[in-house]
UniProtKB/Swiss-Prot annotation:
This is Endoribonuclease YbeY. It comes from Saccharopolyspora erythraea (strain ATCC 11635 / DSM 40517 / JCM 4748 / NBRC 13426 / NCIMB 8594 / NRRL 2338). Belongs to the endoribonuclease YbeY family. PANTHER family: ENDORIBONUCLEASE YBEY, CHLOROPLASTIC. Its cofactor is Zn(2+).
């Protein structure tokens, strides 16, 4: 799965983490490994221009999704047997998201994760214009984020345990040495 990211926002963000949550969401939605996605982080004025041009709404917003193809609702890219797909672009505005994160009481990175998953779901054909659509999309978004956080925490615990085990083994001279004959 190819995920390109470009930070043109002037705000320093951990780009690999944004790519990671996008990949996790696409995997959870069973999107083909041949799919391609682009994520662009932009400044407030750029987002304002995009928001007005494409949504006819004034001012900036947090996330916009631009699908490359119109998908038949019965043939979304997350449906079984879907082949390669150029999903489209997700545009994030970290400066706008920073204020939302503060109001929500969480970090900018948590907000960018949420917005990335939100954008992925829009590219896959989900929407929240109607109450039932909103329940489905936001429920799925929250589940993907909870699963992502749980998987990340489990990986961090496993890495910490490996480091602790290595330190103990090294202290007693039993740690494996890299070199010929070792794995």
């Amino acid at each position: 799965m190819s995920i390109e990211i470009a930070n043109e926002s002037g705000v320093e963000v951990p780009e690999p983490s944004i790519v990671s949550v996008a990949r996790f969401a696409l995997d959870k939605m069973s999107v083909s490994q041949l799919a391609e996605l682009s994520i662009v982080l932009v400044e407030l004025d750029v987002m304002s221009d995009l928001h007005e041009r494409w949504m006819d709404l004034p001012g900036p917003t947090d996330v916009m999704a631009f699908p490359m193809d119109e998908y038949d609702s019965s043939r979304r890219p997350d449906s079984a047997g879907a082949g390669p797909a150029l999903l489209g672009d997700i545009v994030l505005c970290p400066a706008f998201a920073k204020d939302q994160a503060r109001k929500a009481g969480h970090s900018l990175l948590d907000e960018l994760h949420l917005l990335t998953v939100h954008g992925v779901l829009h590219l896959l054909g989900y929407d929240h214009a109607e109450p039932e659509e909103e329940r489905e999309m936001f429920g799925l978004q929250n589940q993907i984020l909870a699963d992502f956080r749980a998987a990340k925490a489990a990986a961090e615990r496993e890495q910490a345990q490996r480091s602790a085990d290595s330190a103990v083994l090294g202290a007693v001279g039993l740690e494996e040495q890299d070199g010929p004959g070792t794995h």
